[in-house]
Curated annotation (Swiss-Prot):
Originating organism: Burkholderia pseudomallei (strain K96243)
Coiled-coil zones: none
Active site: 229
UniProt KW keywords: Arginine metabolism, Hydrolase, Metal-binding, Zinc
Protein name per the record: Succinylglutamate desuccinylase
Family, per entry: Belongs to the AspA/AstE family. Succinylglutamate desuccinylase subfamily.
Cofactor binding note from Swiss-Prot or TrEMBL: Binds 1 zinc ion per subunit.
Entry EC number(s): 3.5.1.96
Catalytic activity: N-succinyl-L-glutamate + H2O = L-glutamate + succinate
Source taxonomy: Bacteria, Pseudomonadati, Pseudomonadota, Betaproteobacteria, Burkholderiales
Positions contributing to Zn(2+) binding: 70, 73, 166
Length: 349
């Protein structure tokens, strides 16, 4: 039988989950207890960790929190590692089943966004089309881990959550914003209120099925899922984590079951109306490198040219999000959105 002291030694690595992952190491044991035996943990593989209260109830929420799907987006990775540490020490009570995922450990170790292909474009089975990519098996592993985790979760609304944390390549008119996957159903008031609590200023609403991690968990696992963009890409150790305090606090309240947060204003809503798709390496994107996400453009403005392809603004005003001419041909080089705050808030389910 494992003694309390042995269990504590086996769980010491939980003080720095990030360091263990960056080193490519495995913990001394695959399962154990922490937080004075109040929490059970199980290491599920590189960058994957499940934590559950020792007295877990059948109707308890199941929450997946992920970061590092892009390996150079370091601030959310550091926040997630600190979350694990505080749960393991007993400083943060755990009142849910929690799956922690550091998405792309190989890219994290290399200090790169990805090794071969953007991992956040490979979910929903798309990884099968790129079998030679080093990201493909990781996408399949993350899908399997999420599906297994949620397979035993409750089915009531709000019983399943997925928060996928990122940072953006460029600045934004709204420094911290969220993206909600398209499910065919109106977005929920529960999610919008949680995002308001996290002081997220804007929400981008997808209108077609995507291949991101949060799209997969929403579609295949029935989770309330969102992608959070929490600032700009910085190297490990160079982040001012205080800038992310409201979002971090909202995640902590979610996993600890607290309901004492002051209600924030609902975020503004923006709906995708089109995208710029890179046809070839001849793409010209008429958006400067320092133009922030959500910058507005007036009707008629030419934003992109690629051979015979043109994209000009069709609505009175469209805002561009994630402009990136460096993506591979066939991929999205920018999203165009319009504000739909009033209608979106009125339709919240």
């Amino acid at each position: 039988m494992t003694s309390s002291a042995d269990s504590g030694r086996d769980a010491a690595w939980l003080d720095d989950f990030l360091a263990l992952t960056l080193a490519g190491d495995a913990p001394p044991a695959e399962a154990g207890e922490c937080a004075a035996r109040a929490v059970r943990w199980r290491w599920l593989g590189d960058g994957l960790l499940r934590l559950e209260p020792a007295d877990a109830a059948q109707r308890m929420q199941s929450v997946l929190v992920s970061a590092g799907v892009h390996g150079d987006e370091t601030a959310p990775i550091e926040l997630l590692s600190t979350l694990v540490r505080d749960i393991a020490r007993g400083a943060l009570p755990l009142r849910c089943r929690l799956l922690v995922a550091l998405g792309n450990p190989g890219a994290m170790r290399a200090g790169e966004r990805y090794l071969d292909d953007d991992l956040n474009r490979l979910f929903g089975g798309r990884h099968a089309q790129l079998a030679a990519s080093r990201e493909a098996p990781r996408a399949a592993q993350l899908e399997a881990a999420a599906a297994l985790f949620f397979s035993t979760a409750g089915r009531a609304r709000g019983a399943r959550w997925h928060i996928d944390m990122h940072t953006a390549i460029r600045a934004s008119v709204f420094e911290q914003f969220a993206l909600l996957p398209h499910t065919g159903e109106p977005p929920t008031r529960t999610m919008f209120e949680w995002l308001g609590e996290a002081q997220i200023a804007a929400v981008l609403l997808h209108t077609t099925k995507g291949s991101t991690f949060s799209h997969f968990t929403a579609q295949a696992c029935g989770a309330l899922a969102c992608t959070l963009e929490l600032g700009k890409v910085m190297p490990f150790g160079a982040n001012d984590l205080s800038r992310f305090a409201p979002a971090d606090a909202a995640v902590r309240r979610l996993v600890s079951g607290r309901r004492d947060a002051p209600r924030g204003a609902l975020p503004r809503a923006f709906t995708v109306v089109d995208q710029i798709t890179k046809q070839s390496d001849a793409l010209e994107l008429f958006v400067a490198n320092d133009v922030p996400n959500f910058t507005p453009f007036a009707r008629g403005t030419l934003l992109a040219r690629d051979g015979d392809y043109r994209y000009a603004v069709r609505h009175e005003q469209e805002r561009i999000v994630f402009p990136n001419p460096s993506v591979k041909p066939g991929l999205r080089a920018g999203l165009l959105v319009i504000e739909t705050t009033r209608d979106t808030h009125a339709a919240l389910a």
